[in-house]
């Protein structure tokens, strides 16, 4: 069978039954296996089993539907499948539709155990890849050699852009592959770069896992893989984001009429809480009204004029009920009114997923989410798809934000702890949502409710994905390892990632490295160049 050729602006494809050969500016960067393995998950008496797909063969033929549109089919012991490759001048989109019945498990893009070949994955000519994420582990690297795998994790940018940018020696530009889903179909956490073997040499494939939370009875099109061609790594992220907005996959936040006070500067009380610790009290235990009055008075005495003050962890007791601890905050309304008289807006630290103190019929459980070499699991978790919890949270937000008598009249939220979430096959929500999709459901609920109560309420958070653009006013650069000594560069890159993923978003530069004076002061001096000083 003859191979098909497609030529775009900066790339060309040679499309055959055994490989989709990708050229960038005339240089071959990868041979993608046309097949994708789609596993399933079954449950019996609370025990979950993953099933790998077997029995598929190299496609007998590829059909050219039109100029730039190609179709082929596959059959395995689990699914009938239809593959589609849609090419345009800027890039190409690869999609897989499964037909049959089952719950989708692990998905290995461009990899399969075909019966008629020893090849199990795709060949690569690129030498390294860029990970658009951030972490506090000093061992984390944004640039990895192609010969090493990367298992994605949720820590700071939650979720990150689901894409990788690849560099090939001899090329100035970059080749990118990104995973894109429809609204409501982000039932996954990870997007991983994996290694395999093709005969005696290394190959690669990309993967995600729906962990059995997406049921198919008929047909379902998996999140697609879109290929991009750009000038550099950040350009790939920008193109990934623009693709979502341009195709209607996501709604763009136009960011019109931004209140002046959203632009700061910001004072956050977290590190001051540590400095104010007394015997027998934890850092979180210093989230007290008297401590924050001291902070407010220090601000005044030093002629610092912030537009907002963040009351950090743990002003509330318990986390789930999310009401001011009466011992620590005997009169939060009096405090917020006093701050308003000083021109300062009060932002409350808010623990996402916090189920502490919630009724049993509003929460869910899950497994520990992978984090470095261990896992994090702090159940119970609030279930944002549960109608009882949704109604409960709306009442909580009204009490905290409203200026009505008896309410707290606060001005917004700093959303945190997004990584401590229900995870795994057993993490069953009332609405059947999971992963990034359930995270979006929680953001949607908080954002829409807050704006209804107080239109200029500020939502400060750390998602770095175009799907979350519409529910984030201010992106927080998040934590920094005090063992490092290059905070300006680390935070500067994170700011560029947020700007690439959510154009125009305000940037909260967050805290400095208090373990090293020189690194801290250098970052302080550079904060205005990066975002809003905090």
Predicted features, each with a name:
Residues 303-315, 393-429:
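Active-site groove signature of glycoside hydrolases
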